[in-house]
Every structure is written in C-alpha cells, then in structure tokens.
Amino acid sequence: MKYTVDTHTHTVASTHAYSTIHDYLPIARARGIKLFATTDHGPDMADAPHFWHFVNLHVLPRVVDGVGILRGIEANIKNIDGEIDFPVRYESRLDMIMAGFHEPVFPPCDQATHTQAMINAIRSGRVDMISHPGNPAFPIDIQAVVKAAAQYRVALELNNSSFSHSRPGSENNCGAIVEAARDLGAYLTFGSDSHVAFSLGNFEHCHRLVTEAHFPEDRILARSPRALLDFLESRGRAHIPEFADL
C-alpha cells in the first residue's frame, strides 16, 4: 500500500534538525507525499523554538504545488498529570498536537509513572496522537495505554526512525503496540520523524510491522490525507477546506 501522509517532521526551528519547510516540498512531490505535518519540538526542549513559532504558523500556505502542510507541534509530556508544554489559549492556532516523552523534559523513571503520564495526556483531550510510544527508555503498560488511546480516540505513532537510529531497541515494543492496537481498535499514524528532508515519507519499518500483524488499513491514518483529516475533525479539530482536493 502507498502511504501519502507523514505526521512527524522537524525543521531548522528545532536546531538539531537541518531542513526548512521549503526543503521538504520537492521531496514530498517526488515521493508522492500529499500531506505532511510540521511538528517542531515543544518549547520546554532546550533547542526548541519559542511558542511564538507555533502561534505564527498561520503564515504558511496551506498547499504548495499540490502538497498540503499541516501546522503542528511535537509537544512534551511534562509530568505524571499528562500536562504538555503548549498554552491552551493558543491551541486553536494548530491543526494537530502530537505529544511524547523526551528525556530533557521528563527524565525516565518507572513503568507505572510513564504509563499514568501517557494515559493522562491521552485523557486530557488536548493530544491527537502520541509520538514514539514504543521508546524503550520509557517502558509503559502497553495494554493499558492502547486501551486508553482506543477509548479516547487518540492515535499512536509508529515512528520509523525509532528502528534505525533514534531509539534502539524499540522494535519489540512497537510490534506489541501494533498488535494491541489491532485487537483493541486503536488508530495508528506513521511518522518519519525527519530531522532532515531526505527521510520524509520513509515508512519502511512501519509498513513491515503493520503487514506482519495484519493491521486493518482503515485504521492507518497515513493511508490518505482524507483519513487523517477526518480523524482530526472527529476529535474536534477545524475543517480545512484548502485540503479538499489533496
């Protein structure tokens, strides 16, 4: 199956990344990516952009040469209460919010704390998807998290970079998440987690896992712009008419 949506990319606004949004566009066109989200790190990361960066994303065109650009953030889950590092009052400026654990903001501790923090973020209503939940540095009760994600209609990310260089040891956890999501009715999203444009739309490992698990295609948000946009609208995000023809 051809996947045409990438929900996790970073730009030079996160200074450990190396591409601009403009850099992503020709690669998106060449690879058949119809829609991608720009999701720079939330402000509590040391090298993240100021929250004004996210507030000002409205200056971006919706569609450039047939490629749609979603305005997003990879926020940080800050504590066991599931709070994230983006002001509620500006949330409407974004099309989607992804959130996850990052060591500089939430130091790894124990499975029970990680699990409760992630479930509380899911329950908060603010988070549309959870980034790299299979990170072995943050062990979780997979069944409990996936059950909450299914109940609250929050997508779980398969992060392709976790299998190659970012989070070694993720594969078994991600496989278990896919199987639990299949059985419990949760949605999956695919993220390249590109920190340079050359990896946009690389879902090699994501595709392999969902194929091996016989995961239902209709719960994979990367399959089409409409699949992702319908999911976000079902969560109360605004309809974006400019994306009608993607």
Swiss-Prot record:
Transmembrane segments: none annotated. The keyword Hydrolase applies. Signal peptide: none annotated. The keyword Transferase does not apply. Zn(2+) 3 binds at E74, H102, H132. GO terms for molecular function: phosphatase activity; zinc ion binding. Zn(2+) 1 binds at H8, H10, E74, D193. Zn(2+) 2 binds at H16, H41, H195. Keywords: Hydrolase, Metal-binding, Zinc. GO terms for cellular component: cytosol. Its EC number is 3.1.3.-. Binds 3 Zn(2+) ions per subunit. Its cofactor is Zn(2+). GO terms for biological process: bacterial-type flagellum-dependent swarming motility. Belongs to the PHP family. This is Probable phosphatase ASA_1316. It comes from Aeromonas salmonicida (strain A449). The lineage of its organism: Bacteria, Pseudomonadati, Pseudomonadota, Gammaproteobacteria, Aeromonadales.
